[in-house]
């Protein structure tokens, strides 16, 4: 079994530890965000995709205006972000906590604005800790493989839990405790069908998702490039109609994460996609 598959299969056991960590640090996390008026979420690569999810989740669950920024963008264009940063807390996302853009961006924010900085990463004692006020460390979620899987899913779980804590959604936080018990049997039941779909002769993947999971889905699309070297893109559900739809055909695998929102609008889109490709995986 490849290392990446080992880490992928371990993600739900790791999720239980991540949820335990959220409960253990619940009071500290709530206090850190209690008087925050706005927040900037920084990351690179996969973590930047997750920063987009984090910004949406914090806005939806806690009513905190949140802006996702690629850490490299911030470094290059730091003066342009002055008004965005000067009264905002900073949330850093990183697998290693050592990514140079993230560490340097944290240092600049602390030096220039005295920013309150929170970090979620999967390595203890990382360089970024020299600039942070609070760290949530998830060492059990650290991926050694180049392509992140377990790290991504656990960072997302931590972000969802953080948003629940900030918004006082105790029921949502409590529900996360059932992730491992639910997810492992569910995934094992789908494995044969997924293997069959993977072996079909598609050449490109399109991942559709809205709202909080959209950033996670963007990272999912990136995984096709990194792991199986297939061209891939993420789009918001209805937004795929505005241009990208013309490239969907029988050579394209479409994965759609359906939300609990307007079901008729989503069903109409999926019906149109099904006319273009039979390779349609709907996650509902």
Regions found by a protein language model. Give the residues of each.
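Active-site phosphate/pyrophosphate-binding segments
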Residues: 2-36, 134-138, 142-255, 263
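Glycine-rich phosphate-binding loops that contact phosphosugars or nucleotide phosphates
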Residues: 34-181, 210, 245, 253-284
């Amino acid at each position: 079994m490849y290392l990446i598959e080992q880490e992928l299969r371990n993600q739900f056991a790791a999720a239980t530890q991540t949820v335990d960590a959220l409960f253990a640090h619940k009071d500290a996390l709530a206090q850190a965000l209690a008087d925050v008026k706005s927040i900037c979420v920084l990351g690179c690569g996969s973590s930047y995709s997750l920063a987009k999810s984090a910004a949406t989740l914090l806005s939806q669950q806690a009513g905190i205006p949140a802006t996702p920024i690629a850490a490299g963008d911030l470094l290059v264009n730091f003066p342009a972000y002055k008004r965005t940063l000067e009264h905002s807390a900073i949330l850093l996302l990183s697998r290693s906590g050592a990514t140079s853009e993230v560490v340097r961006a944290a240092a600049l924010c602390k030096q220039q604005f005295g920013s309150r900085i929170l970090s979620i990463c999967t390595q203890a004692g990382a360089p970024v800790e020299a600039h942070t006020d609070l760290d949530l460390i998830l060492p059990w979620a650290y991926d050694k493989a180049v392509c992140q899987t377990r790290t991504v899913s656990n960072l997302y779980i931590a972000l969802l839990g953080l948003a629940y804590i900030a918004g006082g959604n105790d029921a949502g936080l409590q529900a996360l405790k059932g992730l491992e018990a639910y997810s492992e049997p569910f995934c094992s039941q789908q494995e044969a069908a997924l293997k069959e779909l993977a072996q079909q002769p598609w050449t490109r993947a399109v991942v559709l998702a809205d709202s909080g999971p959209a950033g996670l889905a963007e990272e999912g699309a990136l995984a096709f490039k990194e792991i199986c070297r297939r061209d891939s893109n993420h789009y918001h559900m209805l937004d795929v109609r505005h241009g990208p739809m013309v490239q969907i055909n029988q050579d394209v695998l479409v994965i759609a994460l359906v939300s609990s929102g307007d079901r008729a609008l989503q069903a109409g889109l999926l019906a149109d996609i099904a006319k273009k490709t039979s390779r349609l995986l709907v996650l509902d």
